[in-house]
């Protein structure tokens, strides 16, 4: 199953995350199919590619709970509620 997930990067105790499309069976920091944006919880900064996210959701990708929350804060409606 393909999911929109967070992939961690950054330094120790200073996490940053990339919003990526990847298979749910891959490791958290494994190879991603596509990068769609990033999220920095320290600065509360978010940048996303809205058109690609909506395209992936329409193709059947499911967003994780955390990614749904980030998209809701960025005022992008996650259409899939699974």
Curated annotation (Swiss-Prot):
Q: What is one GO cellular-component annotation here?
A: mitochondrion
- Keywords, A to Z? Chloroplast, Plastid, Ribonucleoprotein, Ribosomal protein
Q: Which GO terms describe its biological process?
A: mitochondrial translation
InterPro entries found in the cross-reference section: Ribosomal_bS16, Ribosomal_bS16_CS, Ribosomal_bS16_dom_sf
- What's one Pfam family here? Ribosomal_S16
Q: Is-annotated flag, keyword Methyltransferase?
A: no
Where is it localised? Plastid, Chloroplast
Q: Name one GO molecular function term.
A: structural constituent of ribosome
SUPFAM superfamilies in UniProt: Ribosomal protein S16
Keyword match Ligase:
no
Q: Which family, according to UniProt?
A: Belongs to the bacterial ribosomal protein bS16 family.
PANTHER family xref list:
30S RIBOSOMAL PROTEIN S16, SMALL RIBOSOMAL SUBUNIT PROTEIN BS16M
Record's protein name: Small ribosomal subunit protein bS16c
Question: Which source organism?
Answer: Pyropia yezoensis
Write the gene name: rps16
């Amino acid at each position: 199953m393909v999911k929109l997930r967070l992939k961690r990067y950054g330094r120790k105790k200073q996490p940053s995350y990339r919003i990526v499309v990847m298979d749910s069976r891959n490791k958290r920091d494994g190879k991603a199919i596509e990068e769609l944006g990033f999220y920095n919880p320290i600065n509360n900064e978010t940048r996303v590619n809205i058109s690609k996210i909506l395209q992936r959701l329409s193709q059947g990708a499911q967003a994780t709970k955390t990614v749904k929350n980030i998209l809701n804060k960025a005022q992008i409606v996650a259409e899939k509620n699974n």
